[in-house]
Swiss-Prot record:
This is Protein aurora borealis. Residues 30-55 have a biased composition (Polar residues). The lineage of its organism: Eukaryota, Metazoa, Ecdysozoa, Arthropoda, Hexapoda. Residues 450-461 have a biased composition (Low complexity). The gene is bora. Keywords: Cell cycle, Cell division, Cytoplasm, Mitosis, Nucleus, Phosphoprotein. It is found in: Cytoplasm; Nucleus. Transmembrane segments: none annotated.
C-alpha cells in the first residue's frame, strides 16, 4: 500500500530512476553468467517464471511503460496544479451548487408574484424611452455616404429610377393573331358551341323538306316550332325512355285527335292531343328473354309470348285497344279520353249503374259519392275479407264517375232550372208564408242529414260484426231511394226539356288522396260542394 508521498509526481520520478539503475546492474550481472539466462528472460513464454523469482516490487517496475522521448508541454500559469493532484479538485460537482440558507422564522410570507398582484408598484417610464432622437447632422452624413455608394458602385439600378417604367408598351393590332379591323368598336366574347353549323329556328320550306328524312324527334325528346306542327305521329315516340325500353316498329297508329276544351270536362293535364295506337312493344324481333316479353304491354292483343307478329290481327288489336281505353286509369284523370268514346258508353254505364246500386252510392243531388275508403274495423278478419273487394269497388266506382259526368251535367242543369223557376214563383205569390215553410223544411233536412251522417259514421266505427247487416240494409235503402228519384227525374227530362236561361257555372274537379286513387267529382256551385258522403266520413262515431 503506497502512501501519499509515493503518489506525487516527483516521488514517482525519483523512484523510477532508481529502479532503472538497479535493473541495468542486474542485467549486466546476468549477462556475465550466461547468455542462456538472458535469452530465457527475454522470451515471452518463460518471462513470467523469471518474474516470479523476483520480488513483488520488481514485478511492478516491469509493468511500467518506458519513458517518452519528448516532454509533455504544460501550461506555465498552472504550475502549482501538479502539486495539488492529491487534493480535492476545484471543479467538484458541489462547488457551484446553490445553497439556500435556512429560514430564520417559520411565519407565513407572501411570494413575490403574489405581492406584485396585491400591491402593484406604479412605475413611470421616462419620456425618452419610447421615441428616438437621432442627431440630424450625423444622419445626413450617413445618408450621403449611402447614396454615394449606390451611385458610384457597379450595382443594379433601383427600379424607381428605371426609365423603362415611364414608357408603355403598345402592341399594334396587326401583330395579334386575330385582327380587329373588321369588327372595330365591337366587343367579342368567347363561348363554346355544340356544332359549327348554326341554323335559325324557322327554316325555309325547301331546306325543311330536305332535312325531314334525317329528323329524329325520339332522340331529342320532343319537337318545337314548325316541326311540331308539320310532323305527323311524332308525339307518339317523343319519350326517350320508351325508346330505350321497347321496340316501336310494331306499333300501329290508329288516330290522332285534338282535345276539345269544354266546360263539362276540365282536365288538369296540359296534354292537347289524344293519340290512339295499338301494337306489341318489345326489345327485339324475337322477344324472347327481353324486357318487353315480361311486360304486360306485350300481351295487349291476347297473343302468347312466342307468337310472332304477322300483321293480320290489326282489327282485333283495334277492338281490344278501344275496350281497354274505355276504362279510365286510376292515376290519370278521365279527361284524357276522347269525347267520342265517352258518348258511346254513356247508356251502357247507366244500365250497369242501375244494376249495381251498392257500387254507385249516388247522393241526393245525383252526383257520385266521393267516399271510396273501405269500412274501418278493428277485426283483422274483416280487413282480410274486404281487402280485395274494396279495390275492385274503387275501380268500378271510378268507371261510374267517369261515365256519369255528362248525364249528371244535364241533370243538374234541369234541377237548377226547375228550382230557380219554383223559387221565383213562390217569392212573387207568398213570400211570408214560404219563408216559414222554408225554415221548417231546412230543419227537417238538417235532422235527416244528421241521421244519415250518424248511421254512416257508425258504419265506419269499430263495432262488432253483428251490426254489419243492419248498416248494409240502411245503405242499400238509401241508395235505392236516390236511384229511384234519379230515374223519375231522368224520365221527366226526356219528356220535357226546358230552355236554359242562365248558363251553368264552371265545374271544378276534386281529387281525393286518402283512398290511394285520384277520385273525381263534379260540383255545380259552391253551395253544393259539401257532399253528404264526405260529411259522413268526417263525422266522428258516438255510438257505444
Amino acid at each position: 500500500m503506497y502512501t501519499d508521498e509515493v503518489r506525487t509526481p516527483q516521488a514517482l520520478k525519483s523512484r523510477y530512476f532508481t529502479n532503472l539503475g538497479d535493473l541495468n546492474c542486474r542485467t549486466r550481472r546476468n549477462s556475465a553468467t550466461g547468455n542462456s539466462s538472458v535469452a530465457s528472460a527475454a522470451t515471452p513464454t518463460n518471462g513470467g517464471k523469471q518474474n516470479t523469482k523476483c520480488s513483488p516490487q520488481m514485478s511492478t517496475l516491469v509493468c511500467t511503460p518506458p519513458p517518452k522521448r519528448f516532454h509533455k508541454i504544460r501550461n506555465p500559469f498552472e504550475g502549482a496544479l501538479a502539486d495539488r493532484l492529491h487534493l480535492p479538485l476545484i471543479a467538484s460537482p458541489s462547488l457551484f451548487r446553490a445553497r439556500t440558507p435556512q429560514l430564520s422564522s417559520t411565519q407565513f410570507e407572501w411570494n413575490i408574484d403574489e405581492v406584485s398582484q396585491l400591491t402593484p408598484a406604479d412605475v413611470e417610464p421616462h419620456e425618452t424611452q419610447f421615441h428616438d432622437s437621432p442627431d440630424p447632422e450625423l444622419e445626413s452624413k450617413a445618408q450621403m455616404a449611402i447614396s454615394a455608394f449606390f451611385k458610384e458602385s457597379l450595382i443594379v439600378p433601383s427600379p424607381v429610377d428605371c426609365p423603362l417604367r415611364k414608357n408603355r408598351i403598345i402592341l399594334n393590332a396587326d401583330h395579334t393573331p386575330i385582327s380587329n379591323k373588321s369588327s372595330s368598336g365591337r366587343r367579342g366574347r368567347d363561348c363554346s358551341v355544340q356544332t359549327e353549323l348554326t341554323l335559325p329556328p324557322i327554316l325555309p320550306k325547301a331546306l325543311e323538306e330536305a332535312l325531314r328524312p334525317y329528323l329524329q324527334p325520339h332522340l331529342a325528346g320532343g319537337t318545337s316550332g314548325r316541326f311540331k306542327s308539320r310532323s305527323s305521329g311524332s308525339d307518339v315516340f317523343n319519350s326517350s325512355m320508351r325508346r330505350k325500353l321497347f321496340d316501336l316498329h310494331n306499333v300501329i297508329v290508329l288516330g290522332e285527335k285534338e282535345a276539345v276544351q269544354s266546360p263539362q270536362m276540365v282536365g288538369s293535364s296540359p296534354q292537347g292531343k289524344q293519340t290512339m295506337f295499338a301494337g306489341r312493344l318489345s326489345d327485339s324481333a324475337s322477344g324472347e328473354g327481353s324486357f318487353g316479353s315480361l311486360s304486360p304491354i306485350r300481351n295487349l292483343c291476347g297473343l302468347p309470348l312466342g307468337t310472332p307478329d304477322d300483321g293480320n290481327r290489326s282489327s282485333k288489336r283495334k277492338l281490344l285497344l278501344i275496350n281497354e281505353l274505355e276504362f279510365p286509369s286510376p292515376i290519370a284523370p278521365p279527361e284524357h279520353l276522347s269525347r267520342r268514346l265517352v258518348h258511346s258508353k254513356v247508356e251502357a254505364s247507366i244500365s250497369s249503374n242501375e244494376q249495381h246500386d251498392t257500387l254507385s252510392e249516388l247522393t241526393g243531388t245525383g252526383r257520385p259519392a266521393c267516399r271510396f275508403t273501405p269500412d274501418r274495423s278493428s277485426s283483422p278478419m274483416q280487413a282480410l275479407e274486404h281487402s280485395d273487394s274494396s279495390i275492385n269497388q274503387r275501380v268500378s266506382r271510378l268507371r261510374v264517375n267517369s261515365t256519369r259526368q255528362l248525364p249528371s251535367q244535364s241533370f243538374l242543369e234541369t234541377v237548377d232550372q226547375a228550382l230557380f223557376e219554383e223559387v221565383e214563383a213562390d217569392d212573387t205569390d207568398e213570400p211570408e208564408a214560404d219563408q216559414e215553410s222554408d225554415e221548417d223544411e231546412e230543419e227537417a233536412e238538417a235532422m235527416q242529414l244528421s241521421t244519415i251522417s250518424f248511421n254512416c259514421s257508425s258504419s265506419n266505427s269499430d263495432t262488432p260484426r253483428g251490426h254489419r247487416r243492419h248498416r248494409s240494409a240502411n245503405r242499400k235503402n238509401l241508395s235505392q231511394s236516390f236511384s229511384a228519384n234519379l230515374e223519375e227525374v231522368e224520365a221527366q227530362r226526356v219528356k220535357t226539356a226546358p230552355p236554359v236561361i242562365n248558363p251553368p257555372a264552371q265545374r271544378i274537379g276534386l281529387y281525393r288522396v286518402d283512398s290511394g286513387f285520384n277520385e273525381t267529382s263534379i260540383i255545380s256551385t259552391f253551395a253544393c260542394s259539401q257532399d253528404i258522403s264526405m260529411a259522413c266520413c268526417s263525422t266522428p262515431s258516438t255510438r257505444p
